[in-house]
Every structure is written in structure tokens, then in C-alpha cells.
């Protein structure tokens, strides 16, 4: 049998119970927060970038009963607060203008918008024609408030993540905190002792 962690690995509240949780390598986590902070949320391209960044984030557990915790790397264990904030950011990034969605469904893209035009009459009064945005005033107002909600949720959740203190682990403190040992000797410690033919008496 190859190397593995000892029986303490499986105790209640131990490493085995955390294998389904989200683990993120510290450098990748800090890089993600830095990139999210620099994104222009008001632009659709920026919101699309958020989706890509979150999809690319590796949250897999870095160890198993047969794989020792990585050496020379620090990992953050994402708790419910962090996962919730990431979920809010993911949902906020999915915001799209209703007019854009309708155009996309109709197979229409890049419709040139007519600019606002102002006409002066002979009497000196002015009339303004609203630009063609493909949406009604009601839809524009709905979009504005929904976008404002999405933008606020994104920035609040990002600030929360930046200020959050997450549990961090590296190999030595991981194995010390959980009281586990890795190796062939640890794996064989639970094996039954070899059969004995009886007590051994010293020679007279």
C-alpha cells in the first residue's frame, strides 16, 4: 500500500469533512480580487470578464487521504460568507440591458443608435428627439434601477471579500492543526500485529 494519511484524517471535523469545501490557492485568490477590483462593471465587456474569472477559479480540494497537502503553497478555505459573496458577484455580472436581450433573441446585433437631435422652430422654441436605443422609457427606467442594484451588490460583495479574514493553511500547520501524519508508517499503523507462536522466554 502507498503512502497515505493516518486514521486521524477521518475523525469528525477533520480534513476528510472539508474535502467537499472550496479551497483556493492564495496567489490565485489575491490575483482574482485584484482583477475584480480593476473591472469596469458599467461595461458589458467588464461584466463578461467577471464570469470568465470566476469560471477559471480552481476551488478543488488540494489534498486527499492519499495525497499530502501541497508543499510551499498556502491555501485559503472559503467559508459560507466568501462563497455567498462570490455568488452575489456571479449573479450581478449576469445583468444585461433588456433592449440588448431583446435584440439578441431577435438575432439583431450592433444596431446603430440615432443620436439625440434638437430642432429650433421659427418661434425660437426647441424640440428634442430621443435617441433610438431600442427600448421604451419604462424599460430604460427599469434597466437603470436594476443596473444600480447589480452594481451596488457587486461592489459591496467585492469589498467584503477584500476585508474578509479567511482561514489559511500550508502543509506544516495543516497537519499540526488536525494532528495528522502522512507516510507509509502512518498507513500501516492500523494493520493488525503478526501472529505470535507464544511468549518468548530468555535463555537461562
UniProtKB/Swiss-Prot annotation:
GO terms for molecular function: structural molecule activity. SUPFAM superfamilies: TMV-like viral coat proteins. It comes from the Viruses. The keyword DNA damage does not apply. Its main location: virion. InterPro entries: TMV-like_coat, TMV-like_coat_sf. This is Capsid protein. It comes from Tobacco rattle virus (isolate PpK20) (TRV). The lineage of its organism: Viruses, Riboviria, Orthornavirae, Kitrinoviricota, Alsuviricetes.
Amino acid at each position: 500500500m502507498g503512502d497515505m494519511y493516518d486514521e486521524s484524517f477521518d475523525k469528525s471535523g477533520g480534513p476528510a469533512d472539508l474535502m467537499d469545501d472550496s479551497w483556493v490557492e492564495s496567489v490565485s485568490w489575491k490575483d482574482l480580487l485584484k482583477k475584480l477590483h480593476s473591472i469596469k462593471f458599467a461595461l458589458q465587456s467588464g461584466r463578461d470578464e467577471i464570469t470568465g474569472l470566476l469560471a477559471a477559479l480552481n476551488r478543488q480540494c488540494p489534498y486527499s487521504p492519499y495525497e499530502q497537502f501541497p508543499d510551499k503553497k498556502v491555501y485559503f478555505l472559503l467559508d459560507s460568507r466568501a462563497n455567498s459573496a462570490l455568488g452575489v458577484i456571479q449573479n450581478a455580472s449576469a445583468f444585461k440591458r433588456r433592449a440588448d436581450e431583446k435584440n439578441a433573441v431577435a438575432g439583431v446585433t450592433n444596431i446603430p443608435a440615432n443620436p439625440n437631435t434638437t430642432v429650433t422652430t421659427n418661434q425660437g422654441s426647441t424640440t428634442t428627439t430621443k435617441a433610438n436605443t431600442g427600448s421604451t422609457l419604462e424599460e430604460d427606467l427599469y434597466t437603470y434601477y436594476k443596473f444600480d442594484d447589480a452594481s451596488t451588490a457587486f461592489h459591496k460583495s467585492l469589498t467584503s471579500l477584500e476585508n474578509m479574514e479567511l482561514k489559511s493553511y500550508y502543509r506544516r500547520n495543516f497537519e499540526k492543526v488536525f494532528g495528522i501524519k502522512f507516510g507509509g508508517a502512518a498507513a500501516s499503523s492500523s494493520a493488525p500485529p503478526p501472529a505470535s507462536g507464544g511468549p518468548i522466554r530468555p535463555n537461562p
